[in-house]
Amino acid sequence: MEPFKRILALDVGDKTIGMAVSDPLGWTAQGLHTIRRETPEADIQAMKIVIKQYEVTHLVVGLPKNMNGTIGPQAEKVRHFIEQLRPEISCEITEWDERLTTKMAERSLIEADLRRSKRKKIIDTAAAVCILQGYLDFLNR
């Protein structure tokens, strides 16, 4: 039996990138952290470090489609980031529809009774967890 390969999910924004990684069995998503975006080179280097550290073989990147399913300006920025990242890593990359994941993450954090200041610090990581858990649930159904 082939061992499970870890999956890394990214919630890519203009200022930050939230990250989550799958457990070794591929059932659950755990939040890692959020990095502050600097330069494309620094962002890619940060991704390479996490990919190596967690032995990631697959990347799932949230694609923020418009509510009608079309690709808007923010999704184009994410695709541009993916195209910059693709030649630098050996992982398969999957785009995953992330509509409403930030809202879902925020609702969960509010229900957990976290103050606004704390929510603001972890919302991107929580959104990455939602993206990855949705993808894992899809794979495991």
Identify the function of each model-found stretch:
Residues 2-8, 15-141:
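Phosphate- and other anionic-substrate recognition elements at nucleic-acid/protein interfaces
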